[in-house]
Amino acid sequence: MNVIFLGPPGAGKGTQSKRLEARYGIAQISTGDMLRAEVAAESAIGKQARALMDAGQLVPDDVIVAMLESRIAQPDCAKGFILDGFPRTQGQAVALDSMLKRRGARIDVVLFLEVDEEALADRIAGRFTCATCGAGYNDLFKKPKVEGTCDVCGGHSFVRREDDRRETVAARLVAYRKQTAPILPYYEAEGLLRRIDGMADIDTVTAKVFEIMDAITKK
């Protein structure tokens, strides 16, 4: 089962991807992590990407797709994979489909988390994490049980991401609307797109994701 998660930044794609991975045994793939791993391993593709990044250039789609092809050939992807954060453009979507077709594979479903952008901005701006263990919290709906103390490790230091500031979030949402949102019709035309209310609580969203996945796997 090969899955793509789509949705604006902060919609909960990472959280739901991890839950999907745990339930169905399919590997979650972060293109950012994948890129860093190839560079660290000094593979041929990694060296090419490193040279581009050192020159201040973006890594082109064909290099990313080549890395992805190498990644999905790994044993942990035998049952399938989950893509979180890729593709981001229609060009990437087309390149991904072409690569998978060459391998005799395909995308089985595209899960789109729909959210209200104003509420989403509030949600993102409220995020903070434990500086010690990385446990996540939110000012709006998930504060530590004891104020100033991490529920998981008991730490007392918390951090907020610089790009979670409201003005930064607004810029990220604008970029998303211009770049990524237009690929929704592409997958809708393929009959792969499934829309999910991303504003529901996390467990409700997970239940809907599992419902969709179970229906597909039973076909």
Swiss-Prot record:
CDD domains: ADK. InterPro entries: Adenyl_kin_sub, Adenylat/UMP-CMP_kin, Adenylat_kinase_CS, Adenylate_kinase_lid-dom, ADK_active_lid_dom_sf, P-loop_NTPase. PROSITE patterns: ADENYLATE_KINASE. The keyword Cytoplasm applies. ATP binds at residues 10-15, 127, 200. GO terms for molecular function: adenylate kinase activity; ATP binding; zinc ion binding. Pathway: Purine metabolism; AMP biosynthesis via salvage pathway; AMP from ADP: step 1/1. It is found in: Cytoplasm. Its EC number is 2.7.4.3. It catalyses: AMP + ATP = 2 ADP. Residues 30-59 are annotated as: NMP. Pfam families: ADK (PF00406), ADK_lid (PF05191). Zn(2+) binds at residues 130, 133, 150, 153. AMP binds at residues 31, 36, 57-59, 85-88, 92, 161, 172. GO terms for biological process: AMP salvage. Residues 126-164 are annotated as: LID. Its main location: cytoplasm. Keywords: ATP-binding, Cytoplasm, Kinase, Metal-binding, Nucleotide biosynthesis, Nucleotide-binding, Transferase, Zinc. It comes from the Bacteria. Belongs to the adenylate kinase family. Monomer. HAMAP family: Adenylate_kinase_Adk. Consists of three domains, a large central CORE domain and two small peripheral domains, NMPbind and LID, which undergo movements during catalysis. The LID domain closes over the site of phosphoryl transfer upon ATP binding. Assembling and dissambling the active center during each catalytic cycle provides an effective means to prevent ATP hydrolysis. Some bacteria have evolved a zinc-coordinating structure that stabilizes the LID domain. NCBIfam families: adk, PRK00279.1-2, PRK00279.1-3, PRK14527.1. Catalyzes the reversible transfer of the terminal phosphate group between ATP and AMP. Plays an important role in cellular energy homeostasis and in adenine nucleotide metabolism. This is Adenylate kinase. It comes from Gluconacetobacter diazotrophicus (strain ATCC 49037 / DSM 5601 / CCUG 37298 / CIP 103539 / LMG 7603 / PAl5). The lineage of its organism: Bacteria, Pseudomonadati, Pseudomonadota, Alphaproteobacteria, Acetobacterales. The gene is adk.
